[in-house]
Amino acid sequence: MEDFSTQLNVLLVDTFNSILRMEESMLKSAGGANLSIGEMHLLEAVGKGDPEGCTISSLARERSVTLPSVTVAVNKLVKKGYVEKQRCEEDSRSVRVRLTQQGRRAERMHSYFHEKMVEAVAKSLEEDEKSVLLKGIIKLNDFFSRKSVSQEA
């Protein structure tokens, strides 16, 4: 039998890749074929932000990417019609990014996909298995969150 580390690595990679494939398939079948997974997750970050809009800086922090990368991605989403940019009245150097109606539709579709995915997983588990799974994933998430923060410092 494989050792724990090897088995865990295979499961993490396979699970991550399976979720990405499912998301890509969902995007294509729902008419969002012109969105990449990264763009979809950026829309999700914009949607979770301030209703008045998010700044490029806050999006970069949220997504753990550089300002230039977010700027390029936001500009692509503007061209595709998913977000709009507006200069801040208080600080003309700052830009706020908001979802358009098309962006809100795509973000709702993505949220619905995640709801259905979680429901399907939960349906196959007993209550004690759900509890164990949550505890394990919470620890896993805490570990990766700490690693992410320590690597940024």
At which residue positions do the language-model features occur?
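N-terminal leader segment of winged-helix/HTH proteins
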Residues: 1-33, 37
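C-terminal regulatory/oligomerization modules of transcriptional regulators
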Residues: 1-3, 128-153
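Alpha-helical linker/hinge and terminal dimerization helices associated
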Residues: 12-15, 19-26, 63, 106-122, ...
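N-terminal helix-turn-helix DNA-binding core of bacterial DNA-binding proteins
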Residues: 24-66
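Short glycine/proline-centered loop/turn elements that form peptide/ligand docking sites
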Residues: 33-36, 52, 69-72, 76, ...
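Residues within helix-turn-helix
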Residues: 56-57, 68, 75, 95
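Charged, amphipathic alpha-helical coiled-coil/dimerization segments
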Residues: 75-135
